[in-house]
């Protein structure tokens, strides 16, 4: 039991280092993806090409989230594997899980992770949105106040986009202007995205793995990984766009709820808007896996345990 706990702590340490490193290295793609998703139809791409330093605005929020999420992931997944393991005599809970039980454990762990990172995702979105307000074209696209609230339009006070650059000032501003609700915006879309992520990734990976099972080489592994990432992004990008919009500083003035957000994007901006930022998200997803695995392996060796245990 002591050895199992020791291995778990080492896994958490290696996972945390890998998660923070991966988050930092791929954050420019996250910045560009989120920036594009926040833009209304017809906004020039150049709007989200500011100084290079802006590409890391909001990275601190995601790094804090990555650290906490990793701890939560290992502990939650370990507990779920133990609960779902039918063979109580087996100490290796993970290896004895069947495909469906493994999917259930992964999905539930993903939902718990999503609930944890929602406040940090909101902070990140606020910081990225505020980093773009220096661009004059963006300032012209503030919410329009309507005389009467309808499903198509929301009649409330327009919420100006504030200029915030640091993590703690962002938290303070969000609480003062929008209250505690500012940290849980986009919860519905985030949970649905996580469920879709887990199920689609599991299904797509299995399908591509079987399709290329005749080729037992490194190339087939790379192809399987890229194909899975492409499928994942293509099928979940609309939910990701809605999530970003619902987490924006002026979401409450523009959308009544998640369904209204989806409807207005479709009617006012067109179907293509649901796939905004997909190229940058694909780049991030494609690179993240390799970076995380490599760093995790190296830290595992330094800590003196097998990363495959």
From Swiss-Prot:
One annotated Gene Ontology cellular component of this protein: mitochondrial inner membrane
Q: Which domain of life is it from?
A: Eukaryota
Descriptive protein name = Uncharacterized mitochondrial carrier SCRG_05595
Cellular location(s): Mitochondrion inner membrane
Q: Which GO terms describe its molecular function?
A: citrate secondary active transmembrane transporter activity
The GO biological-process annotations, alphabetized, read as: mitochondrial citrate transmembrane transport
Organism (species): Saccharomyces cerevisiae (strain RM11-1a)
The family annotation for this protein states: Belongs to the mitochondrial carrier (TC 2.A.29) family.
TM ranges are: 12-32, 47-67, 100-120, 184-204, 222-242, 285-305
């Amino acid at each position: 039991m002591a050895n199992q706990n020791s291995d778990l702590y080492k896994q958490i340490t290696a996972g945390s280092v890998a998660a923070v490193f991966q988050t930092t290295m791929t954050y420019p793609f996250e910045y560009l993806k989120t920036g594009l998703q926040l833009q209304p139809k017809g906004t020039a791409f150049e709007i989200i090409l500011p100084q290079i330093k802006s590409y890391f605005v909001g990275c601190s929020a995601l790094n804090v989230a990555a650290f906490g999420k990793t701890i939560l992931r290992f502990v939650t997944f370990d507990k779920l594997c133990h609960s779902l393991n039918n063979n109580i005599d087996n100490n290796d809970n993970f290896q004895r899980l069947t495909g469906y039980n493994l999917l259930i454990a992964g999905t539930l762990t993903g939902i718990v992770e999503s609930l944890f990172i929602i406040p940090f995702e909101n902070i990140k979105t606020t910081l990225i949105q505020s980093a773009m307000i220096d661009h004059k074209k963006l300032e012209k696209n503030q919410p329009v106040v309507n005389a009467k609230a309808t499903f198509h339009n929301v009649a409330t006070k327009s919420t100006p986009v504030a200029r915030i650059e640091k993590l703690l000032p962002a938290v303070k501003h969000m609480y003062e202007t929008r209250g505690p609700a500012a940290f849980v915006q986009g919860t519905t879309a985030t949970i649905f995205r996580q469920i879709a992520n887990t199920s689609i990734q599991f299904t797509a990976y299995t399908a591509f793995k079987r399709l290329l099972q005749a080729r037992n080489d490194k190339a087939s592994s790379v192809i399987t990984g890229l194909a899975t990432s492409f499928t994942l992004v293509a099928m979940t990008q609309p939910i990701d766009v809605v999530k970003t919009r619902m987490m924006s500083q002026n979401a409450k003035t523009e959308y009544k709820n998640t369904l209204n957000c989806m409807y207005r994007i479709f009617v006012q901006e067109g179907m293509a808007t649901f796939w905004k930022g997909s190229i940058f998200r694909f780049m991030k997803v494609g690179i993240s896996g390799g970076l995380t695995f490599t760093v995790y392996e190296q830290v595992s060796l330094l800590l003196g345990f097998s990363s495959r245990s």
